[in-house]
Amino acid sequence: MFSRQFGRLATLALALAVAGCAGGEQSTTAEAPSEPAPVAKPDVVSAATGELSNFSTADLKQAKKLFQAECGRCHVGGQTYGTYNSTDVSLSYDALTNATPPRNTVAGLVDYMKKPTSYDGRTDLLKTGEHASFTGLGDEKLRLIAGHIIKEATSNPNWGQGKDTR
């Protein structure tokens, strides 16, 4: 209940702040944006979100708990916090997509959790001690954790976006 009220208050505050930016004056000319808007990759993102149809609501609740228990110490909010001397590669959808090999699918993330490699795919992070081993969790738990990561990376705009977004 509290979070719903907080969300409504935050939305109202944002609307008031945006309205206040106009300074009471209405502009009659359109300004060109200073930077082009980012172009979404709908085919790639929809493929990833399509994978989520394989998860029930109960699966995703369990997945969140598993992520928090097994990954949450180092990956709060999808960001990497330097444990195991990491290079601070986040779990944002873009970071997962641009990894070598790509980790933006459930199968790709399960593979990573079984055999973690550096972002460029060249270094075995188990051998260097830079990542924990999750092989003992079994395929189903790894699949659930991967589902949680994909869900957050495709639906939560703050996921993996920096250390200040906790």
From Swiss-Prot:
Heme c binds at C71, C74, H75. Transmembrane segments: none annotated. It is a peripheral membrane protein. InterPro entries: Cyt_c-like_dom, Cyt_c-like_dom_sf, Cytochrom_C550, PsbV_cyt_c550-like. GO terms for biological process: photosynthesis; respiratory electron transport chain. The keyword Ion transport does not apply. Its cofactor is heme c. GO terms for cellular component: photosystem II; plasma membrane. Residues 1-32 form the signal peptide. GO terms for molecular function: electron transfer activity; heme binding; iron ion binding. Keywords: Cell inner membrane, Cell membrane, Electron transport, Heme, Iron, Membrane, Metal-binding, Photosynthesis, Photosystem II, Signal, Transport. The keyword Membrane applies. It is found in: Cell inner membrane. It holds the Pfam family Cytochrom_C550. Binds 1 heme c group covalently per subunit. Belongs to the cytochrome c family. PsbV subfamily. Probable low-potential cytochrome c, might function in photosystem II (PSII). This is Cytochrome c-550 2. It comes from Gloeobacter violaceus (strain ATCC 29082 / PCC 7421). The gene is psbV2.
